[in-house]
Design a protein with these regions (language model features):
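Ligand-binding cleft/hinge of the Venus flytrap
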Residues: 1-18, 22, 52-55
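Short glycine-/small-residue-rich flexible loop motifs, especially phosphate/cofactor-binding loops
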Residues: 4, 12, 30, 48, ...
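Residue-level detector of short coil/turn "hinge" positions at structural boundaries
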Residues: 14, 58, 165-166
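Structured loop/turn residues at beta-strand edges in well-structured enzyme cores
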Residues: 16, 36, 168
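Pocket-lining segment of extracytoplasmic ligand-binding domains
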Residues: 25-117
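Secondary-structure end/capping motifs
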Residues: 83-163
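C-terminal solvent-exposed extensions
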Residues: 153-180
Length: 180
């Protein structure tokens, strides 16, 4: 959805100006690309850096940079749960904030060392390259606030993709009370 949104923002009609292959299992798109399917591919990490490292292609752009800040990861809870357990929501939010503070104040190498055990299948140099790329793209926000601008962008993308029938009011779904 984000890729097609970016194409449309740049005057490219995904339906008529190019062919997007969407019938390849998500887990093997990198292999299909390296094997000769397609001229470009959209990949998450560590696959994008893996293609580059193995000489199968180059990372030429980041959807996150070109789209604007899209809140890929959001955490949800029922209003009743938040009312009954505000201390849990606040503690969880503080934990996420500590992580953001860490990644925004430490080197790519330091971060890669800390997260390496979670990515046993990815060698250290690749992991460090990925973290460096995320740093250079400002992937990690400074805070946990889900802004109204990001919410509107997300709805624009969903609406453009045809999966959102009716827009929702920001205040009806988002609270920043635990982020302040």
């Amino acid at each position: 959805m984000v890729f097609e949104y970016i194409l449309k923002m740049n005057g490219i009609d995904p339906a008529t100006d190019l062919t997007i292959i969407q019938n390849i299992d998500f887990g093997v798109t990198a292999e299909a690309f390296v094997g000769g399917t397609g001229d470009y591919t959209v990949e998450f990490e560590p696959f994008a850096t893996g293609i580059e490292k193995d000489g199968g292609g180059y990372v030429i752009a980041s959807l996150g940079v070109d789209s604007g800040y899209v809140p890929y990861t959001c955490f949800s809870a029922l209003g009743s749960y938040m009312n009954e357990h505000p201390e849990i929501i606040e503690s969880f939010t503080r934990g996420i904030q500590k992580g953001l503070d860490y990644v925004n104040s430490h080197s790519s190498e330091e971060i890669a060392k800390i997260i390496q055990p979670q990515f046993e299948e990815t060698d250290f140099d690749t992991l460090k390259t990925i973290v460096e790329r995320y740093h250079s793209q400002d992937t990690w926000k400074a805070d946990t606030i889900f802004t109204e601008d990001a919410f509107e962008l997300l709805q624009n993308i969903l609406e453009e993709a045809g999966v959102l029938d009716k827009r929702v009011d920001y205040d009806a779904l988002v609270t920043t009370q635990f982020s302040k």
